[in-house]
Amino acid sequence: MKKKFFLSAILISLFGLAAAKPVQADTTVADIQKRGELVVGVKQDVPNFGYKDPKTGTYSGIETDLAKMVADELKVKVRYVPVTAQTRGPLLDNEQVDMDIATFTITDERKKLYNFTSPYYTDASGFLVNKSAKIKNIEDLNGKTIGVAQGSITQRLITELGTKKGLKFKFVELGSYPELITSLHAHRIDAFSVDRSILSGYISKRTELLDDSFKPSDYGIVTKKSNTDLNNYLDNLVTKWSKDGSLQKLYDRYKLKPSSHTAD
């Protein structure tokens, strides 16, 4: 069953761009309400954030729940469009989703291309390794191969960290988290690196999460750069939910503990 799910996840990632239906360019809040449907790009392979059950087809996670909360505020239905780190930007650019809520890290470079709301979650990056490899810290990864997701900033962050510590790494980029965890289990890579909360969903009897973490970063809801109307509306919602405890309820629901700060 797991193999079928992994294959399904890969196929949906490849064909997601073609399958998604276009939405109106620079969709306003009023447009969405008139349409009666909010179209949101979400992950489908990240437990606790955006995960699609292969048996029932239902989504769960703080990000899919957050999308539903936005839809409830607008009094419309929500439609989830599965995305990856590779496809979430193009789908937004091509007006096939209204927004992305998909572990999209806020960076200065990305803010030149897209609008981001205030952060709804802060997480640090880490490493998942096979227990049998006896890897205990980042120094043990010197010269080894680290798997990262295509389209993510993880490789750059690890390289910067390695430069500071005098370490060098090899990298393999893969299109989805199921591909990465499969490669780790098969010992084709020595470690799988992404945000720690994402990695926590893939811990098993065979794997463990290293204590080492690096570069805490913020996730934001993403809209097109030109769509200030929708971004302002969403930012107000995130700010409100941060203050009234709604975001904390989401963290508690999925047993998540955000990092308390963002690294310099």
Segments (PLM) and residue ranges:
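Extracytoplasmic small-molecule ligand-binding "clamshell" domains
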Residues: A25-A102
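Bilobed "Venus flytrap"/periplasmic-binding protein-like clamshell domains
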Residues: V39-P47, Y59-D72, F104-T105, G126-S176, ...
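Periplasmic-binding protein-like
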Residues: T122-V129, R196-T239, K257-D264
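Extended ligand-binding regions for polar small-molecule ligands
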Residues: T64-E73, I135, E139-D140, K144, ...
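Ligand-binding clefts/hinges and TM-proximal coupling segments of bilobed small-molecule sensing domains
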Residues: D26-T28, T154-V172, S204-S213, T239-D264
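Beta->alpha turn/N-cap motifs
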Residues: V42-V46, V81-Q86, E95-T107, G151-S152, ...
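Acidic, polar ligand-binding/catalytic clefts
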Residues: K68, D72, K77-D140, T207, ...
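A ligand-binding cleft/hinge motif common to bilobed small-molecule-binding domains
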Residues: F104-K112, L157-G162, T182-K215
